[in-house]
Amino acid sequence: MAKQKFERTKPHVNIGTIGHIDHGKTTLTAAITKVLHDAHPDLNPFTPFDQIDKAPEEKARGITISIAHVEYQTDARHYAHVDCPGHADYIKNMITGAAQMDGAILVVSATDGPMPQTKEHVLLARQVGVPYIVVALNKADMVDDEEILELVELEVRELLNTYEFPGDDVPVIRVSALKALEGDKEWGEKLLELMAAVDASIPEPERDIDRPFLMPIEDVFTITGRGTVVTGRIERGIVKVNETVEIVGIKPETTTTTVTGVEMFRKLLDEGQAGDNVGLLLRGIKREDVERGQVIVKPKSITPHTVFEARVYILNKDEGGRHTPFFKNYRPQFYFRTTDVTGVVTLPEGTEMVMPGDNTEMTVELIQPIAMEEGLRFAIREGGRTVGAGQVLKVIK
């Protein structure tokens, strides 16, 4: 089958289905592809349920996660949609950011209302930066009583408010994924209504290229007669020749320098941008002034820190993680971007220990500063082996 050309003309948005087990996330994902296929057959292939359900495994920060990816288009947009088969896969995906979501469809069964995993997913969405939610009140064909539907809707809105989402304004669309998947026309219309709500309520993300310049340093070389070159992949923003940049992290002080050259594939460029693997020639910098693990950034856009609060997922032993719990003052390595830094863990009040397979909050104090901001992701390692993954929730100092 010929690969279809990726159309750059439409805005691209990443979304996913979240919610309690058996509330119909995967059925809804399949039904969306069916209804959009019927509405725009030239744009959308239909992806059947069983194809989404046997999601392939992928690795993110050393953690194996099952994630199904489907794509589809509405009139307005191109979507990449992720769906995970298991509850643990969701937690791992949301914490590691394996598949980043610009927004989510929260699936709640009208017959059950919000359940424990509904709450856990909403809390995680709030913490790990899934900024927007649209609600699909699923299995609405199985509830005849209008009052019950209204009560469930109210409960979902209250839950969203509890976790600081705008629960009163979030669109709640009553759907029946199964009926729509079976080809029922009226329920198919409701799914088009759901996607119209997603189009309208989940804004386009800010593109990486529009954010302040940042490049993690992977390697440092000296080129005789020209100076010091640092290489890496530009994470965000643009860097132009002759711009002033800062070198942040690892060392106690931040260094300012000028980029005198940008090279890619041995060619000189005027600028490098997000996604490019480049070498940057730095003025007046000695080989020993810079090292892997530091970042080159737009001045004043990010600062070095050592103490932070984080949300982490700890691998269980079947995933290659620890076999035993850890306690406060645990001292693993924290792998940020390109390097490991040792840190000391403090557990939240009332938590004595963390078991393999748990997800928890913790405070960490690193022995060296790292260029850090809220949302930054990291792996937790012991001697090069990944035992967990996390995300910075709050920078303390």
Curated annotation (Swiss-Prot):
Residues in tr-type G domain copies: 10-206
Task of the protein: GTP hydrolase that promotes the GTP-dependent binding of aminoacyl-tRNA to the A-site of ribosomes during protein biosynthesis.
Enzyme kind, highest EC tier: hydrolase
Subcellular location: Cytoplasm
Pfam families to which the protein is assigned, alphabetical: GTP_EFTU (PF00009), GTP_EFTU_D2 (PF03144), GTP_EFTU_D3 (PF03143)
UniProt xrefs under PANTHER family: ELONGATION FACTOR TU, MITOCHONDRIAL, ELONGATION FACTOR TU-RELATED
Region (G4), start-end ranges: 138-141
Keywords: Cytoplasm, Elongation factor, GTP-binding, Hydrolase, Magnesium, Metal-binding, Nucleotide-binding, Protein biosynthesis
Chief site of localization: cytoplasm
Gene Ontology CC annotations of this record: cytosol
Region (G1): 19-26
UniProt keyword annotation of GTP-binding present: yes
Binding site for GTP: 19-26, 83-87, 138-141
HAMAP family per the UniProt record, alphabetical: EF_Tu_B (MF_00118_B)
Ranges for region G3: 83-86
Catalysed reaction, written as an equation: GTP + H2O = GDP + phosphate + H(+)
EC number: 3.6.5.3
Protein name: Elongation factor Tu
Stretches the record annotates as G2: 62-66
Annotated Mg(2+) binding sites: 26
Protein family (similarity comment): Belongs to the TRAFAC class translation factor GTPase superfamily. Classic translation factor GTPase family. EF-Tu/EF-1A subfamily.
The keyword Iron is assigned to this record: no
Subunit structure: Monomer.
